[in-house]
From Swiss-Prot:
SMART domains (alphabetical): EF1_GNE
Function of the protein: Promotes the exchange of GDP for GTP in EF-1-alpha/GDP, thus allowing the regeneration of EF-1-alpha/GTP that could then be used to form the ternary complex EF-1-alpha/GTP/AAtRNA.
Similarity field: Belongs to the EF-1-beta/EF-1-delta family.
Keywords: Elongation factor, Protein biosynthesis
InterPro entries in the record: eEF-1beta-like_sf, EF1B_bsu/dsu_GNE, Transl_elong_EF1B/ribsomal_bS6, Transl_elong_EF1B_B_arc
Protein name per UniProt: Elongation factor 1-beta
MF terms (GO), sorted A to Z: translation elongation factor activity
């Protein structure tokens, strides 16, 4: 098994959700799963809405990114989570 870099797209439930607090929750959740969070970018979309893009490094294993996606989707203030890029390192 190898190491993969995964870029996730995390959408908050509303524009009122604090970007910094959400980014901190994402990083804390990812790192509690023994996954490395390399970077977090916040990109504006429209009408005050934004998306958070954490870049994570994890071991390639059965189930892929599902466990981390589910953990992030269960956070308060998160509407949806999806993988937008996955590459083998």
């Amino acid at each position: 098994m190898g190491i993969v870099m995964v870029k996730l797209k995390v959408m908050p439930v509303s524009p009122e959700v604090n970007k910094d607090e959400l980014s901190a929750k994402i990083k804390e959740t990812v790192e509690s799963m023994d996954i490395i969070c390399r970077n977090i970018e916040v990109e504006p979309l429209a009408f005050g809405l934004y998306a958070v893009f954490p870049l994570i490094e994890m071991e390639e294993k059965e189930g892929g990114t599902e466990p981390v996606e589910e953990a992030l989707a269960n956070l308060d203030d998160v509407e949806s989570v999806e993988s937008v890029e996955v590459s083998l390192v």
